[in-house]
């Protein structure tokens, strides 16, 4: 994810200061940001296609209500989150919106995999902080996650921040956020 501005960071304890460069590009993982994006999109659509203004506004109103319900449902589902470590440092928007307790990441830059020393530190962190789950992503080989989890009392799960395994369609975004919620909840 070099094109995302990811930089190598050795310490992931402070999740208020993610190492995404100046901006974290994973804005879609907070549904409130999705509402802002939708409002902007509709504004531009209306500017360029004013004859369909009422349709755009009607669709926007429905989408905003659906997002509000999504946020409420996910907050209720994740009301007792356990601690986890994620594959890469991409989830701060989701973490902050839904109070998810992510204690670290295997890598900040997905082009640079962690070495033996960093993996040992992660195993130590898992034991010390009583991390209950570590997550891989479908876009990347889970061997590192499985190697760390081997011989440890820890669950593994999959987070898909891109929705790579979802079918395209009008429910895609909602499925993406719900699936992330289910992954955190189930792990």
Positions of PLM-derived features:
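Extracytoplasmic metal-acquisition and chelation regions
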Residues: 1-187
């Amino acid at each position: 994810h070099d094109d995302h501005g990811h930089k190598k960071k050795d310490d992931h304890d402070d999740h208020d200061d993610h190492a995404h460069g100046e901006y974290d590009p994973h804005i879609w993982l907070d549904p409130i940001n999705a509402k802002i994006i939708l409002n902007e999109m509709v504004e531009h659509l209306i500017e360029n296609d004013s004859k369909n203004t009422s349709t755009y506004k009607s669709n926007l109103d429905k989408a905003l209500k659906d997002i509000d319900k999504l946020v409420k449902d996910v907050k209720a589902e994740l009301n007792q989150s356990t601690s986890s470590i994620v594959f890469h440092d991409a989830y701060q928007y989701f973490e902050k919106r839904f109070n998810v307790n992510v204690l670290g990441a295997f890598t900040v830059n997905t082009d640079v995999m962690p070495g033996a020393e960093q993996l040992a530190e992660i195993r130590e962190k898992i034991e010390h902080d009583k991390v209950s789950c570590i997550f891989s992503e479908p876009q990347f080989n889970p061997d590192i996650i499985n190697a760390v989890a081997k011989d440890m009392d820890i669950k593994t799960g999959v987070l898909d921040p891109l929705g790579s395994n979802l079918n395209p369609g009008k429910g895609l975004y909602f499925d993406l956020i719900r699936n992330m919620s289910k992954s955190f909840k189930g792990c």
